[in-house]
């Protein structure tokens, strides 16, 4: 989107624009020169007009579907808004008298951050993950806020000359949104906890509490400082609308609107959430066969080829469907634009159902020695890679042992996972440079010259949502720059105080590269609900820059990933605050508070677990004979991870003994990328056997293919402007990203999730826009809320009752949860044993 010269707002211009919007025109009008009308009379006219329009708006909402136009938009002022999904969901009502940062906000934010961080950290050291769902927190906070509004005293106090009260009145939507945003700031365990636990449990380096917390805080907050640089591109323009937050806005509207208008919406949401909660017990616990219905495997029963092609847990998942919402929700099908999911589906289908089967059955890269869809790391004989065989007692690389043993090997699908990851990162950056480079440079050039209290984008000047909040004070650029500088200074000091092996220039370089990736990734995230990130690039870059320094690699990887992700998290939350009409200052305070409080809880809970349980229990180093067990590289040990928890849940076999799987994966990653290094993994010239690595082509060809695909698209755009290439629903970066999702996640996710996307964002949105506008997001939020609540209940039940080898909470085995093959895809007698369990 090209930026035009900025025109400052005036009262007169606002008035004329209001009338322009009332007539449905998406164009900027100029000031009237009529000197016969005073500014006061104009304001009176506008206020009277606003009252009438508010009454009209209330009438529209009272009549439900009858008030929606053909596109599902209730407010005529928004009929030409550039993003119809926003116009259908976000209303134009704002009450500046509503309290925002109240005592209730601080109280509930603190409660939920403490509860959420404690639960997520406990399960960080369990074999399966449980966290408080954002929708559950949103629902509970709604009722808790109403309870506080009725119970707290309303008597005002005066402190330091400032008048305040514990209870300013009605529980408002803005307060509610700030509590949820503060919780989001720490809803997941801080990513830096992985390296800290790996350093202590494997490398014997225990950081003191002040420096450990400093590490966690700086990795979480550094990215926030970049938001000031990018908010004019990633937050203000209407086109940057963040599809994933619209369901949250829809739920806020249902909870805080006029009960006469929203009662039916709330009833529908509660009915859907309740039904989902009841149903989800079937695939999650009682009848897990519903999680995976491998039709091809059933039809071809007895054939090992059909087993490999059709199994969704061990094979390629062709014709595998799921009736488990946890799998169906994989692509966020009710929230993500259909064109984005179509790109991901095309990439995944080409990789999983065509490329991988052909390569596997032709034994490419020795595929037949490994499971077809495994994300584990193996040795050349096909067994799980044993890191302890190549490490000295001081946890350094034993080069002789490495040459006698093996360099890492992967299944063909997991090797291609890295190829697609490199290609998606390259394509993402190339696309932003070629198609949006001029706009980006112009916006960045004006960052420091923009007035923090005025609209900063020509489209923002025409945006009716901006006009509702144009009088709110904006956070100056200098405050974001100060936050960034403080985090970098503290982070640099912590590197040396904590002996993190990373030099000061390494931190600055990693943050700079992450900042460069943030903008193209953010543009994709804000429009397509797809976040590519820096997972692949940061690991390879850190390993290449700091070979032989595993702790430095872990540290650099965390900063590289978190700076980008946290910047986009705050940008997304700023957009949510914009939709909820929350001033930027108040939102930033709430977000930083939640993010700042979380690391203290993460570290305290981790210390309690490690000090009480010990390393042996957490790492499973003691076998039944009391001997130390060798450490193999588990799922995702080479840099990926995930998906295994869903398979374990579907099988209904939960063990709750302590098991620091995530910590093991961080250690394994530090060995592969830090101790051995990318040169050995992808082939190098050091004279070792790894110089002939079968993966030496992955990195250069991945980056080249990604850039070449976008370059070809750009050349077509230049050669044939009439074809309007930029309007094609085709994005190479998203296609490659879709291919990279597997085998990290089970292929059971793919078919059913795409079918739900077509039904919602395709059929219902196009052919039933009124139904879509009113119910789609509430349907998705209700299904997510109910399904996630079941996982929370099961997780807590397993934690409390299934301890010390006891299985008090378990479903008796029956036909619907077979102990051998929960999906009834039984392995045939001639199935190669390596597919079921590596040696």
UniProtKB/Swiss-Prot annotation:
Where is this gene product found? Membrane
> Coiled coil where?
none
Segments traversing the membrane: 105-125, 177-197, 210-230, 268-288, 315-335, 345-365, 415-435, 478-498, 505-525, 585-605, 665-685, 697-717, 728-748, 781-801
Compositional bias (Gly residues) spans?
629-646
Alphabetically sorted, this entry's keywords are: Glycoprotein, Membrane, Peptide transport, Protein transport, Transmembrane, Transmembrane helix, Transport, Virulence
Q: Residue spans with biased composition (Basic and acidic residues)? A: 44-58
Q: Where is the composition biased (Low complexity)?
A: 23-36
GO cellular component terms attached to this protein's record: membrane
What is the protein name given in its UniProt record?
A: Oligopeptide transporter phomP2
Tell me what organism the protein belongs to. Diaporthe leptostromiformis (Lupinosis disease fungus)
> So which residues have sugars stuck on them?
33, 36, 386, 398, 749
- One example GO MF annotation: oligopeptide transmembrane transporter activity
Region ranges (Disordered): 1-58, 629-654
Q: What is one Gene Ontology biological process annotated in the Swiss-Prot or TrEMBL record? A: protein transport
Q: Family assignment?
A: Belongs to the oligopeptide OPT transporter family.
Q: How does this protein sit in the membrane?
A: Multi-pass membrane protein
| InterPro entries documented for this protein | Oligpept_transpt, OPT
Q: Out of the domains of life, which is the source?
A: Eukaryota
Q: Identify the coding gene.
A: phomP2
Query: So what does this one do?
Result: Oligopeptide transporter; part of the gene cluster that mediates the biosynthesis of the phomopsins, a group of hexapeptide mycotoxins which infects lupins and causes lupinosis disease in livestock.
């Amino acid at each position: 989107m090209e930026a035009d010269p900025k025109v400052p707002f005036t009262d007169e211009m606002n008035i004329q624009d209001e009338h322009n919007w009332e007539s449905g025109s998406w164009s900027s009008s100029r000031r009237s020169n009529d000197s016969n009308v005073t500014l006061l009379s104009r304001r009176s006219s506008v206020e009277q007009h606003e009252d009438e329009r508010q009454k009209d708006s209330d009438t529209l909402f009272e009549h439900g579907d009858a008030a929606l136009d053909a596109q599902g938009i209730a407010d005529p002022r928004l009929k030409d808004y550039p993003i119809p999904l926003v116009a259908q969901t976000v209303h134009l009502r704002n009450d500046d008298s509503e309290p925002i940062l109240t005592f209730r906000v601080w109280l509930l934010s603190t409660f939920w951050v403490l509860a959420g961080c404690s639960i997520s950290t406990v399960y960080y050291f369990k074999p399966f993950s449980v966290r408080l769902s954002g929708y559950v927190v949103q629902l509970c906070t709604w009722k808790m806020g109403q309870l506080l509004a009725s119970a707290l005293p309303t008597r005002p106090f005066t402190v330091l000359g400032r008048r305040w009260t514990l209870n300013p009145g009605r529980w408002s939507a803005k307060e509610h949104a700030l509590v949820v945003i503060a919780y989001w700031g720490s809803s997941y365990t801080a990513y830096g906890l992985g390296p800290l636990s790996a350093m202590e449990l494997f490398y014997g380096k225990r950081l003191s509490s002040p420096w450990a917390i400093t590490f966690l805080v700086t990795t979480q907050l550094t990215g926030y400082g970049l938001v000031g640089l990018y908010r004019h591109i990633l937050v203000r323009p209407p086109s940057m609308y963040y599809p994933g937050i619209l369901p949250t806005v829809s739920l806020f509207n249902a909870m805080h609107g006029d009960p006469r208008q929203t009662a039916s919406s709330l009833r529908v949401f509660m009915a859907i959430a309740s039904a989902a909660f009841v149903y989800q017990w079937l695939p999650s616990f009682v009848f897990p066969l519903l999680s995976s219905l491998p039709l091809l495997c059933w039809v071809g029963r007895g054939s090992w080829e059909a087993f490999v092609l059709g199994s969704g847990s061990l094979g390629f998942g062709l014709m595998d469907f799921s009736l488990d919402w946890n799998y169906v929700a994989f692509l966020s099908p009710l929230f993500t634009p259909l064109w984005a999911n179509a790109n991901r589906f095309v990439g995944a289908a080409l990789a999983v159902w065509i490329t991988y089967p052909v390569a596997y059955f032709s034994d490419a890269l020795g595929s037949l020695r490994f499971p077809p869809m495994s994300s584990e790391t193996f040795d050349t004989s096909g067994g799980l890679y044993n890191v302890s065989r190549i490490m000295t007692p001081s946890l350094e690389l034993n080069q002789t042992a490495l040459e006698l043993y093996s360099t890492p090997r992967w299944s063909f699908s997991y090797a291609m996972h890295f190829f697609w990851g490199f290609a998606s990162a390259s394509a993402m950056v190339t696309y932003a440079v070629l198609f949006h480079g001029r706009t980006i440079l112009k916006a960045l050039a004006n960052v420091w010259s923009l007035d923090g209290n005025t609209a900063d984008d020509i489209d923002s000047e025409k945006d009716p949502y901006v006009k509702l909040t144009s009088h709110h004070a904006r956070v100056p650029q200098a405050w974001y720059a100060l936050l960034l500088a403080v985090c970098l200074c503290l982070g640099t000091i912590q590197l040396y105080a904590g002996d993190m092996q990373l030099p000061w220039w390494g931190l600055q370089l990693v943050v700079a590269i992450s900042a460069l990736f943030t903008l193209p990734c953010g543009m994709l995230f804000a429009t397509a609900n797809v976040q590519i990130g820096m997972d692949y690039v940061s690991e390879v870059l850190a390993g290449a820059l700091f070979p032989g320094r595993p702790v430095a690699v872990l540290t650099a990887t965390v900063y590289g990933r978190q700076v980008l992700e946290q910047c986009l998290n705050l940008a997304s939350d700023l957009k949510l605050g914009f939709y909820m009409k929350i001033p930027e200052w108040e939102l930033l305070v709430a977000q930083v508070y939640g993010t700042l409080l979380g690391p203290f809880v993460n570290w305290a809970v981790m210390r309690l677990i490690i000090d009480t349980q010990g390393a042996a229990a957490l790492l499973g180093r003691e076998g039944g004979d009391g001997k130390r067990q060798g450490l193999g590289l588990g799922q995702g040990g080479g840099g990926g991870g995930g998906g295994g928890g869903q398979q374990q849940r579907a099988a209904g076999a939960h063990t709750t003994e302590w098991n620091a799987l995530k910590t093991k994966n961080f250690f394994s990653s530090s060995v592969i990328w830090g101790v051995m290094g990318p040169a050995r993994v992808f082939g190098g010239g050091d004279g070792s056997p790894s110089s002939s690595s079968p993966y030496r082509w992955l990195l250069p060809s991945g980056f080249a293919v990604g850039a070449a695909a976008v370059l070809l698209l750009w050349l077509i755009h230049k050669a044939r402007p009439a074809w309007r290439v930029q309007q094609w629903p085709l994005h190479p970066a998203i296609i490659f990203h879709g291919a990279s999702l597997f085998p990290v996640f089970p292929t059971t996710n793919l078919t059913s999730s795409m079918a739900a996307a077509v039904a919602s964002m395709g059929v219902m949105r196009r052919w039933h826009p009124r139904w879509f506008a009113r119910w789609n997001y509430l349907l998705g939020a209700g299904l997510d809320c109910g399904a996630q609540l079941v996982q929370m209940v099961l997780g807590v039940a397993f934690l409390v009752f299934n301890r010390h080898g006891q299985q008090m909470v378990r479903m008796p085995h029956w036909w619907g949860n077979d102990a051998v093959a929960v999906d009834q895809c039984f392995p045939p007698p001639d199935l190669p044993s390596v597919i079921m369990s590596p040696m």
